[in-house]
Amino acid sequence: MFGSRKASRRRSYRSRSTMGSRVDIDFCKFEEPPSPREGERRCLFVLDPLEHYVESKDRMVELLPGRVETVDGVNTYYINGCTTEEKFPGLDYTCYRVDLRDTYRSRCAVPPEATPEEKFISHRHRKLIPYNSRKPVVVYLPEDAQLHYRIWTGGQEVVAKKAEE
């Protein structure tokens, strides 16, 4: 019983080649988004299907674009930039374009014995988007960037009480 439900939701990928071609994944059908611009790459993924009420009321996706950089292990690092929404003609879903700029760090003194390390540094202003398994998440990034994401789950609603006087 458990296995049969999961097995029916497995994704089947078909080849994706040009704009206008149809991509079918069991629960998510969509038109191929445009190719990335020069100096960019495209990340495309679909989310696991959930009940409609859960998707619309209880889940959000946080996009975490960033780069792997050498850091000192002491300071806090972040990348400036912006994430914008784009609608393309013929597509019924939103695409996102990320512009990553300079990396900044806090100004803590670094001890001489600290060793530099490679670490993923994320964009300072993260984007929360609605969870929707029926549409793909398409993000255009600079070639040297990576995309991480988190699924946020809402908790139980709590009614705020009036402040006592």
Curated annotation (Swiss-Prot):
Gene3D superfamilies: Ecotin. InterPro entries: Ecotin_sf, Prot_inh_ecotin. Pfam families: Ecotin (PF03974). GO terms for cellular component: flagellum attachment zone; paraflagellar rod. One of its GO terms (molecular function) is serine-type endopeptidase inhibitor activity. Belongs to the protease inhibitor I11 (ecotin) family. This is Ecotin-like protein 4.
